[in-house]
Amino acid sequence: MYTSEERCNQRTQKRKIYNVCPQKGKKIFIHVHAITQIDGHIYQCLECKQNFCENLALIMCERTHTGEKPYKCDMCEKTFVQSSDLISHQRIHNYEKPYKCSKCEKSFWHHLALSGHQRTHAGKKFYTCDICGKNFGQSSDLLVHQRSHTGEKPYLCSECDKCFSRSTNLIRHRRTHTGEKPFKCLECEKAFSGKSDLISHQRTHTGERPYKCNKCEKSYRHRSAFIVHKRVHTGEKPYKCGACEKCFGQKSDLIVHQRVHTGEKPYKCLECMRSFTRSANLIRHQATHTHTFKCLEYEKSFNCSSDLIVHQRIHMEEKPHQWSTCESGFLLGMDFVAQQKMRTQTEELHYKYTVCDKSFHQSSALLQHQTVHTGEKPFICNVSEKGLELSPPHASEASQMS
């Protein structure tokens, strides 16, 4: 396989052999493998029959056929056909956007991206989706959009056979196999596989929250979180369960809910092989293997503080509310309700649910509240075998469906 430079050298040698065109009496230079020059001006690629006025343009065309990409990025080792493409690409790493819109001051890495954007100001939206009527400034954007209706995913990963509707999504996915993370934060040097991940991360340093709700003035760093929040106001629940037709505002809530029907428990404890429907439940469970509560009278240990309390009541034969502070730092002698009230007054609400913005003192309370949204009933009554969300009257009778 010849490089474009070698082909160019061969063309120069061939020109000394073929001198005159028999039809027009003008000079004609022919390279039998790649190129024909007619009238000293037209260069034709014999692979695709495309004509060019300049030899350099022909070389660029040849590289699309040979796959040759001689220009390499020093930051991520990506290669390009033209030096101009490399220069445009390097602006991503340098966060440089030299092409500014005079109408709204938006900036872009490439002049073509600016041209496409400017059509939105001129009202020129030439490409309309026949299915939903949405307009686009470029035909390529319409083509990608239509795949959301057809379900077409033409970009296939050769490693795991996963398909994607966009080539950029495939490129990003491949990095999960290679471990490549070309986008680096200049503040903390943390690296990311996708540019959007880097942009979102940088907002943790700048404090920027560009997505603002016009209903309640809440703001968000991530567009996805903002979209989910807006559904609180609109009541929209686009994710529907195929088994019971219950609807949800978040896809993650639907996935968790569907495990009620399928019985799937993908989160497994490697210590005892117990399985759970939620990752949060697994994390909470794993703490039982690492934290123990010791009895001061006997050398017996418990995984839960509540088990220790019950044990102490049995062997001490004392009223439970007369105990002093135990070794683990809990006020066991206090009435539980009074203790919870004190926590409410003194502690901040650390656990917040993004769907309805309710906050809780404990992660367990947040997990129980989430079942209101997901419809999940992870506990079963030993007497009636009825599924429960762990309501107080049944709490003592309930055993977790692990």
UniProtKB/Swiss-Prot annotation:
Zinc finger feature spans (C2H2-type): 43-65, 71-93, 99-121, 127-149, 155-177, 183-205, 211-233, 239-261, 267-289, 293-315, 351-373
Keyword Cytoplasm carried by entry: yes
GO molecular function terms attached to this record: DNA binding; zinc ion binding
Protein localization: Cytoplasm; Nucleus
Sites bearing Phosphoserine, chain numbering: 391
Any one GO cellular component localisation term in the record: nucleoplasm
Top-level taxon: Eukaryota
Pfam families documented for this protein: zf-C2H2 (PF00096)
Annotated keywords: Activator, Cytoplasm, DNA-binding, Metal-binding, Nucleus, Phosphoprotein, Repeat, Transcription, Transcription regulation, Zinc, Zinc-finger
General function of this protein: Transcriptional activator. Important for maintenance of pluripotency in embryonic stem cells. Binds directly to the POU5F1 distal enhancer and the NANOG proximal promoter, and enhances expression of both genes. Can also bind to numerous other gene promoters and regulates expression of many other pluripotency factors, either directly or indirectly. Promotes inhibition of MAPK signaling during embryonic stem cell differentiation.
Oligomer and partners: Interacts with POU5F1.
Note in the entry: Significantly enhances POU5F1/OCT4-SOX2-KLF4-MYC (OSKM) mediated reprogramming of mouse embryonic fibroblasts into induced pluripotent stem cells, and can also substitute for SOX2 in this process.
Similarity-based family: Belongs to the krueppel C2H2-type zinc-finger protein family.
Record protein name field: Zinc finger protein 322
Source species: Macaca fascicularis (Crab-eating macaque)
Gene name per UniProt: ZNF322
